[in-house]
Curated annotation (Swiss-Prot):
Protein name from the UniProt record: Putative manganese efflux pump MntP
One GO term (biological process): manganese ion export across plasma membrane
NCBIfam families for this protein: PRK11469.1 (NF008546)
Protein localization: Cell inner membrane
Topology of this chain in the membrane: Multi-pass membrane protein
Species for this entry: Yersinia pestis
Described function: Probably functions as a manganese efflux pump.
GO cellular component term of the entry, any: plasma membrane
UniProtKB keywords: Cell inner membrane, Cell membrane, Ion transport, Manganese, Membrane, Transmembrane, Transmembrane helix, Transport
GO terms for MF: manganese ion transmembrane transporter activity
Amino acid sequence: MNLSATIILAFAMSMDAFAASIGKGATLYKPRFREALRTGLIFGVIEAITPLIGWCIGLFASQYIMEWDHWIAFSLLFILGCRMIFEGMKQRVAETEKMRSHSFWVLVTTAIATSLDAMAIGVGLAFLQVDIVHTAMAIGLATMIMATLGMLIGRYIGPLLGKRAEIIGGIVLIGIGFNILYEHMHLTA
């Protein structure tokens, strides 16, 4: 795979993380650049690791994992999305009571859920002549950049939307989950 194809793949793989991080940024009380960078790093590292895992799986057991990856991603995103919607529907909270940061595990779970498609890509890359390490690094870097930008964009969208931002963020996560299911069903049909 040439450099331009790798860059296009990397940024395409980062779009789920970008959308999810906009929702995450919108639900925080004035997230700082440090929080945005932390989110970007978590998403980027996980998004870089998953194609490597997928590549290894592709070498050994692709038919088994491909049957379930979309259901795992959908379930995680659906649960997280429902949780965000539920929190957004609770009694309105003053701006000063909004969270200052998301927990590490919430970010990791969201990052894993949005990166399972990168694992599936890694499975496919196992059958091509690619430098998987450089490709995974490009995917991780693009995701880090896009997730950081998403958090910063969410910072400015959040005050405009108030608590609705959390509901919208939850809907976005559920939508990403349904999109993963749709793409899988469409590809297997």
